[in-house]
Each structure stands twice: as structure tokens, then as C-alpha cells.
């Protein structure tokens, strides 16, 4: 199987095999991974199926009965080893990430810092899985609640944040005593494999962490959802696929964490600090080329400041440098593939047809390939696709509003509820809006919710899914509560 050279200090990180039960396995059947910036072939990766996935699940189940009995302090030490190795190799993994995903190297390094925070956090949380003792109304009885690991877990991760989604899902599971089968996105398997390689080096016993790759995820997904040995699935991706996984998992009653699509509103009130709001929107909207589930998708600006704010924002957008993620000057890389380009074009075409104005951008970039111009649309209305559908690209549509009540209604007029953002200096308004907006996460006077790392819970409501990752709540989805009742205590 072919694999290209990437300038790494630790060349052992670039692996095009899968880890199953402590053994690195290849396959005669492979698929190709390309660099979205250049179109160059990076590697040929094993195209595995049901047989290999079943073997990985069996290995994880066998390992679970040993790993779950390892003292929490020892699991913590192994997680700390993993943390240390990922920190030492973060720059190399960032290069792999940029090569296969496209985002600027500086952004990839930022993602690595975010990914690392979850390993560090849950290495400590492993030692803090506490139960409870409850008073019993009956004399000579005692009641207790224990927390135990849920069992074998599957992590199905996306291409847009291929490092962070591995650690955000696996670190709390490992801390709890769970074992894993990981299925990374077919566009970005090398980043995930590198992290798994370092986990193996850190001392995780064989079978505790397994990874399977495939060009056609349906076969692996069907095995994961139907196999009774899998007790929990954590998935980040589209709402459409999340529904399929949930339906397929119903017969085996699996525990699910689903972080799905978003259509985030970004609101700028007339009392806001406009410069802060512009910078917040720039960071949130064009990070990863808009290819983030929490990316601002609908931008509402109060009518009194609308023209001023749009003008300020367009000035900043024109400063973005589109290019290969490995180029030092690039501040925005390519989209992941042609399908992503076509969706952005469709949303722009629909908006312009219905009366929107292109303030800047609006077409594929002169670099060609998967590159697209950062685009700003004004005079957008709620009848346009970009105001109701997730674009997942570098498109910023501006909508005018009059009152607070009106914009809250606009913000909540969607089936999704992952992230939202607003800027205001009025403390009373801040409380009202924060409580009224229907989303799992709210950024207040900031355009980046997730840059706080593992400290804050991450997850949505409505059709954006359920479950929380990160923070002290993040380990709960990997635990079951067992009630103990003691009698005849004299």
C-alpha cells in the first residue's frame, strides 16, 4: 500500500494500517486519500468491512473485562503517558492533519491543542468517578450507588476535526474503563491512526483501542449498530446520518451520544462593541473555511448598525489569504471536496436569485480545485437557503432585524440547536437572550465557543443531537449507575 512522504520528525506516525487487537493489519482492498489543496495522492488505506469490524469488537470486548478492572489511578497514568506523547508529537500530527484535511497549519496546531486538552482533563477525571451513599428509611439498611463503565464503545468521527473528535470521545471513555472501536472519516484517517499509534506507545493494553477504516462506511456502521457487544456509540456528523445510526441501534438498545448538524445564529445588537463583534465573527465564520458544525450560519445585525457592521466585516474578509494549508501566509485553506464547493455555490445562486447582494467573493477561487472565495452576502432574507440550511463553507449571509424579540424568534426558527452567538454590552439583555435562545451552547461576546478546551460541555438540543462531551459532565455518558441495597446490618 502506497504512502507519501511528509516532513515529520517522528516518521513512525505516518501509518497506513489499522490496529486490531494489538496488531497492525493491512488489506488487499484499499482506498486513496488525497490532499484537498493539491489533489496529490497521500496514501492508500485499508478498505475494511464487516469481518474486520467484528474482530475489532471482539477484541474490545475481551479487553474490556481486563481494562475495566484496572485501578483508576493506573488508567490515569496511561492517559497521562498518552497526553505526554501527543504533546511531544503535536507538530507532526498537525502536519499530517493539514495534508489530508487542508486547514492552515496554524489552525491544525490549534486543533491539536484542543485535542490535547481532553486527554489531560480526563486523565484527572479518571480518579474522580464518585458514587453516593443514600439514607434508607428502613432501620438496619444502607443504600449505595456505584458508577461503572458502560462497556465496549464505538467512536465514529468526522473529517473536519479529525484529531479533536478522537480525543474528545475516547479520553473520557478510557478514563471510565471503556474500550473502543474507532471509525474515522474516510477523508482523514491518517490523523486518527497517528493518535492510535501514540496510544499504543503509551501503554494501552491490546484490544483497548482499535481502529478500522473504510471508503464505504455503511458496512462498518451496520456492524457497529447491530452488534450486541457494542454498548455505546458516539457520533459526530450530519443529522441525517445520526438518525440512521439511531434507528439501526434501536434493536440493541445502545447508549448514544450524537453531535449533529447546526445552523448557528450570530446576533449583533446595536449596543455591541462592533470591533469585537467583527473579530469574533471572522474567527467563528472562516475557521476551517466555515466547515465546522458550530460555524455561524446566519448573521443577524440590528438595523441601526447594519450598514456600518457589514462594511467593517467586508474590509476584514478581504484580508484573508486563501491557499495551501502548508503555506505560511495562508489563513484559509480549501474546502474538503467538490461536493462542498457545489453546496456553497448553490446557496449563493439561490440567494442572489432572490435578491441578495454579493459584497465580496461569490465564486470559486482563482487557485482552482477545492478553493473558494470567502463570500459575504447582504440583503439576505429568511426565505433563502443560506438562512435556513447549514452551508458548511465560507459564506457569511447578513440579515437585518429590528427588535430583540424579533431576532430571538428568527434564531429559534430552525430544527437545529447546537451553537449560537450574540454580542451586546447590556447585562439584562445578555441574560434574557442567553436563556431564550434554543441551543446547547451560547457564545456571548465571543465567536469561538470551543476554544476553552475540555473545560466546557459540548453538545446540542433539538435536531442537533444529545449528550455532552468535555467538562466534568463528559464522562457521564460512559458510565452506568448501579444501585446497591444492604440489609440486616445489626
Protein language model features and the residues they cover:
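Residue-level signal for inorganic ion chemistry
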Residues: 39, 75, 97, 119, ...
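Structural signal for hydrophobic packing residues in well-ordered secondary-structure cores
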Residues: 64, 68, 83-90, 94, ...
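Hydrophobic face of amphipathic alpha-helices that form TPR/SEL1-like repeat modules
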Residues: 1-38
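Short, well-ordered beta-strand elements within core beta-sheets of diverse protein domains
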Residues: 41-48, 63-69, 155, 266-269, ...
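Conserved C-terminal structural/oligomerization subdomain of aldehyde/semialdehyde dehydrogenase
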Residues: 38-44, 230, 267, 321, ...
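Glycine-rich loop-to-alpha-helix module at the N-terminal edge of alpha/beta enzyme cores
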Residues: 40-129, 140
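Rossmann-like NAD(P) dinucleotide-binding subdomain of oxidoreductase/dehydrogenase enzymes
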Residues: 131-276, 401
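ALDH superfamily catalytic-core signature
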Residues: 240-381, 444
